[in-house]
Amino acid sequence: LTIALTATGLASATLVSLFAINKVIGKIATSKDLLNTRNKEIFNWRFGDISYSVTGEGKPVPLIHNLKEDSSSIEWSQIIPELSMNHTVYTIDLLGCGLSDRPDMICTSFMYTQLVGDFVRDVIKKKTNIVVTGKSAAFVLEACSNEPDLYGDLILINPDSIRNFRKAPSKRTKTAVFILKLKIIGTFIYHMMCRKKKIYNYFEEDGFYDKENIPEA
């Protein structure tokens, strides 16, 4: 009984500490307001509100960001000014990313395929070219295949293999999902995966050819 009480006490203390750490990290991470809400619009999608912005005039071009733990529409911030000179540029935060809703559910590639199609159909409302990067390329290709009349030219930037998105979840994946859905523990793991040093290491090793082009945050 004593051992059980001690273990319970240690577990509780650990969770309290992680909760406090999460609060501090969250406050520091949002202090610069990098994901500001200015000029943002909301697409009331059936699985949650989707944040997006519209810039410029001309042929429509939605920009679909990568699907990593630290991804959001801010990835496109360096090219929007030039691209918007001749296009209507739509930058979207995918469900669970940026300023969009984070529903208590597992977001699948099929769900993102539906999101892209619904956004083009209900918000843009005309045939559009589309630009996508990284892991998101797979479900955008699926969306284009489902409704080819909605899309014109498609630009893929560093696309991941479509085969990776057709794999069934393994037991290891299901265990990881269970742990990540434990709010305090999952949030702490997310913060560790998205810490500034880790992001900059990715930029230096894989993200940028020229390190001098890495933006300061």
Describe each PLM feature range.
Residues L1-V61, H87:
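Alpha/beta-hydrolase fold catalytic core
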Residues Q78, E142-N146:
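Active-site signature of alpha/beta-hydrolase-fold catalytic machinery across serine-
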Residues T91-V131:
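Active-site loop/oxyanion-hole signature of alpha/beta-hydrolase fold enzymes
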Residues V131-V140:
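Gly/Ala-rich beta-loop-alpha elbow adjacent to hydrolase catalytic centers
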Residues R166-K167, Y190-A217:
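Conserved alpha/beta-hydrolase catalytic His-Asp/Glu region
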